[in-house]
Amino acid sequence: MDEMAATQASKDPGAKFYRKGLDAMKAGNYPVAIVQFAKIQHSYPKSPLSEPSQYFIANAFYENGKYEQAVLQFNDLTMRFPNSRFLCESLLREGQSFVRLNDRIDARLTLQKLSSNNNCSDESVAANNMLKNLGSD
């Protein structure tokens, strides 16, 4: 957990769910992590922990091999939080999810969107490498 999230978590009513979710993520118990982070989404949607919780839900689905659900959750994050500090990572993971689903068209579109984002330098490099590997149809 980063310092900003730790500070927010200590004051937030959803902090106990956030901590339990992070602990479950670290332990590789992704279904439990999803449940804990979802409690924040449902009970405290305006919480400062809502944004990182959304990211961790999406990431937990990805890590658990549930790529369709991951795509939906990463997309939800980018729609709900268009200026998210997790935007670049989310677009990359969404593109990776599409690749895992063998959806080359949506993978390419997502990775191109990421590649053209000037604020995502590290992730743009990864996106460009993935685009090269996808080739052209």
Task: Describe the predicted segments one by one.
Residues 1-137:
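Acidic, polar-rich low-complexity tracts and alpha-helical solenoid repeat scaffolds
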